[in-house]
């Protein structure tokens, strides 16, 4: 039996092994079998089936007893994975106790087993995601605090703007992760609910015992009992997928920024170095942003997967034709992609290399122009905004045309020196003195991160 998806050549790069195991063949089958075992226990508790039927059914509810290849061939004609699995389960039970076989899957429908099994998988997936988000947030918090006062060029439209700090850039991602963690925490009780409605959602086959069985089944599985079955109401799954799309997008933005800062012309930060990491098959000098590539790839693929789940929402009546089927591989792939991106982001940040000297040197590439705003604002307080803007703009133009430092041009301009001393100009043109509220933003992001805390859930 396969414990991981078959596409291992690329999955090891793009996906995290623990999440791949959750959605492996074994993981999928075990989720449905856990539902079937819990159903037998719940029906025995409520007197629907004899207590003697429970042990034989439970003993047969182990994924390793079943051949996924044989089941896969049967799925091709059955239309879903639960039908051949329940048949195989019945045969397995009958081999040990023919009487107990009569009570397998009693009152349930295929989608009950598949959806409840999926929710059990998602519980494990959610725990893994929350753990990795917490770890990534902790590493981010440490790095943001460490570099709260490390100046580098802010970039707007990919051009140098005014100085910012590396800590502020990292705190931006930390704030996004805090919000994503809040979203996952809020949706958890909505997502982790039982699916149990029988043929058309009424549980008519169980008569007056329907609600007692449903309540007992939810308790057995540790899931909430929803207001009614949700066979064709898929908002819970789509909400979860949407948050994963947000996580992927935030990580992709970070990967994009890191890769741009790693460009030869910038050289301000680098992914961790290591033997064989980020090399080229032809150019020995290359140090490619291989982790950033995973973050960007996940952010590129995730919107399409989320879109598929949105497109699958208008499901027909009480059981969908094709739209439900479109979910089966889409949501697991999204979970695996986001988990892989989180793992890569953690490794990237834990070993992030920062060249603060190169950052300061790059700030000087425009010969002081990135601090022109600081001078303009200081002059505006004395000669008015428009006059100050016009004067500094003229000085900037001369500095560019003459390829000189803005400080020198400003010092020679009588209208400037009449208002600002040399010491004042030096201070205004020092990036460290024009960082605004960058440190405050870092501190606020750190405070929100620490206030959220962590609520561990077993995977």
Curated annotation (Swiss-Prot):
It is found in: Cytoplasm. Belongs to the class-II fumarase/aspartase family. It is an enzyme of class 5 (isomerase). Pfam families: ADSL_C (PF10397), Lyase_1 (PF00206). Homotetramer. Keywords: Aromatic hydrocarbons catabolism, Cytoplasm, Isomerase. The keyword Protein transport does not apply. SMART domains: ADSL_C. GO terms for molecular function: 3-carboxy-cis,cis-muconate cycloisomerase activity; lyase activity. Pathway: Aromatic compound metabolism; beta-ketoadipate pathway; 5-oxo-4,5-dihydro-2-furylacetate from 3-carboxy-cis,cis-muconate: step 1/2. One of its GO terms (biological process) is 3,4-dihydroxybenzoate catabolic process. One of its GO terms (cellular component) is cytoplasm. This is 3-carboxy-cis,cis-muconate cycloisomerase. Catalyzes an anti cycloisomerization. Its EC number is 5.5.1.2. The gene is pcaB. PANTHER family: ADENYLOSUCCINATE LYASE (PTHR43172), ADENYLOSUCCINATE LYASE C-TERMINAL DOMAIN-CONTAINING PROTEIN (PTHR43172:SF2). It catalyses: 2-(carboxymethyl)-5-oxo-2,5-dihydro-2-furoate = 3-carboxy-cis,cis-muconate + H(+).
